[in-house]
């Protein structure tokens, strides 16, 4: 059987089978490897592979899962460690480049709404989603003493316990093959498996090509913002005092500057537009080099009475170098900000998939004008598009930011909230009665509070990791386009994610597309000598 670090696909990751197969046959605990796009059920039958082969660019995260199974005897005092990776010419990727998490299962007590279409929820049950880190993300020191700890752990009879492994390939790594090992220790014995990594001859940009804006309501500390950015997702707003650090170390490239007009889906009223000088003062306080935007109104496509006020807001912010972002379908009434320049009153149109499909003509019109279009996701709005709720297949999270966004020329992504936690978020992801009588497990909570695991800020969910991998897929396509191979790049992208309806549900197909992109870029970069992404590889606008 063969896997990659992100999905099941032939010829990429080959596992040794002898150790785990023998263990299962004897009814003793087993260890095996699973790809990152595979959810390991609490009682799934054990797999059979123990060795890992990965391929990745510099500056890229690549992930896999180390799974322990208690079989008929259980497993106690389990820990997992990873060695340095040794590479060409004495090069070393230190073990500190790996981040490990114990996956915590959460219970979905009732299914997300099921529209009976091509993309249906998987229903009630226990899902691995929350990630308990082994080490502090800032200091790298082991965590201990919190109410939830990663290691050591026990595995009950017949149950599984996966460990999520992130490898961040250093931006300074030389291309070539690197090898090392992981070791699982327990009271019942130890197992060591091999890790092989091929570092491709190109580097992902520190600031992702795909813009994003994900909102914190209560947990937006600097530590929380850095955790989001580590996962290639940008917070909505940032403090000007923190921006230099976030730009240098975490790839921040855009920020919302405020203010909000007060208009949203339930309120067709806007406050008067701030003056040009007010917008200029706000803009001047931000760090140079950031794309500045104002998320001025939310879901107001039904509020035609607001169009004159929207134009005034846009005209004033445009004179201050700020872009206007509104979640609504394009409408010709807002194709001008009233200045006579031809610039639209909305620079960044943010659409749900169903909104996009219902306004394709208008989307083409605003893109032709030079506006940009982003996507967003919430609840269950249709029967066909990707969903970001816990009981949907992992492919849902990866396909939207990556291949669908590239195929539809979308340049950004928005999510309304990442920290809408119930009173006990580590043990309850359900919310029936909050948005409707239905349950939308995990809606508005892509991160978990850090206090319970002993870290500042927040910790990621597996869903956030899959979104991150999609953002990296977007970069792969963007880099290949920048190397003069746009037709090939788009052909590969559209083979798996052509639009909101016809995207693949096959994790192996996604990994095959990524592998083809990576190998092609690696060959082109090796032939032409440069080792970083070509200039001009960013999408226009944003």
Where are these regions (language model features)?
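An acidic-aromatic substrate-binding cleft motif
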Residues: 190-273, 277-299
């Amino acid at each position: 059987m063969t896997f990659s670090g992100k999905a099941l696909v032939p010829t990429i990751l080959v596992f040794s089978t002898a150790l785990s197969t023998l263990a299962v046959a004897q009814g003793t605990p087993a260890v095996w490897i699973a790809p990152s796009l595979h959810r390991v059920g609490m009682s799934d039958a054990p797999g059979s592979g123990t060795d890992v082969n990965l391929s990745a660019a510099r500056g890229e995260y690549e992930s896999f899962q180390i799974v322990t199974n208690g079989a008929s005897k259980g497993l106690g005092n389990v820990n997992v460690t990873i060695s340095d990776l040794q590479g060409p010419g004495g090069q070393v990727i230190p073990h500190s480049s790996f981040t490990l998490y114990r996956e915590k299962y959460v219970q979905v007590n009732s299914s997300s709404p099921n529209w009976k279409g091509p993309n249906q929820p998987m229903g009630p049950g226990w899902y691995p989603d929350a990630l308990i880190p082994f080490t502090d993300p800032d200091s790298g020191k082991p965590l201990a003493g919190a109410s939830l700890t990663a290691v050591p752990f026990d595995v009950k009879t017949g149950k599984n316990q996966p460990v999520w492994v992130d490898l961040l390939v250093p931006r300074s790594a030389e291309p070539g093959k690197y090898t090392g090992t992981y070791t699982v220790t327990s009271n019942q014995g130890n197992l060591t498996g091999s890790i092989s990594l091929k570092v491709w001859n190109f580097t992902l940009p520190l600031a992702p090509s795909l813009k994003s804006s994900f909102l914190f309501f209560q947990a937006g500390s600097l530590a929380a913002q850095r955790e989001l950015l580590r996962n290639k997702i940008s917070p909505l707003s940032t403090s000007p005092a923190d921006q230099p650090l976030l730009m240098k170390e975490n790839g921040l490239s855009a920020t919302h500057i405020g203010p909000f007009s007060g208009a949203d889906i339930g309120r067709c009223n806007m406050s008067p537009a701030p003056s040009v000088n007010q917008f200029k003062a706000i803009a001047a306080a931000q760090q140079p080099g950031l794309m500045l935007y104002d998320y001025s109104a939310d879901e107001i496509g039904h509020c035609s009475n607001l169009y004159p006020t929207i134009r005034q807001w846009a005209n004033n912010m445009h004179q201050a170098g700020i872009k206007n972002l509104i979640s609504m379908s394009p409408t010709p009434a807002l194709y001008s900000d009233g200045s006579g320049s031809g610039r639209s009153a909305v620079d960044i149109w943010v659409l749900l998939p169903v909104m996009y499909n219902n306004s394709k003509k208008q989307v083409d019109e605003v893109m032709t004008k030079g506006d940009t279009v982003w996507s967003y996701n919430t609840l269950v709005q249709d029967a066909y598009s990707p969903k970001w709720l816990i009981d949907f297949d992992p492919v849902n999270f990866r396909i939207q930011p990556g291949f669908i966004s590239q195929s539809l020329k979308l340049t950004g992504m928005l999510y309304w909230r990442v920290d809408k936690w119930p009173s006990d978020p580590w043990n309850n992801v359900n919310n029936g009665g909050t948005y409707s009588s239905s349950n939308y497990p995990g809606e508005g909570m892509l991160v978990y509070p850090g206090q319970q695991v002993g870290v500042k800020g927040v910790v990621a969910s597996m869903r956030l990791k899959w979104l991150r991998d999609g953002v990296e897929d977007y970069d792969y396509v963007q880099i290949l386009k920048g190397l003069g191979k746009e037709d090939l790049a788009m052909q590969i992208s559209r083979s798996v994610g052509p639009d909101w309806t016809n995207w693949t549900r096959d994790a192996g197909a996604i990994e095959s597309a990524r592998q083809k992109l990576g190998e092609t870029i690696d060959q082109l970069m090796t032939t032409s000598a440069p080792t970083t992404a070509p200039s001009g590889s960013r999408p226009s606008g944003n």
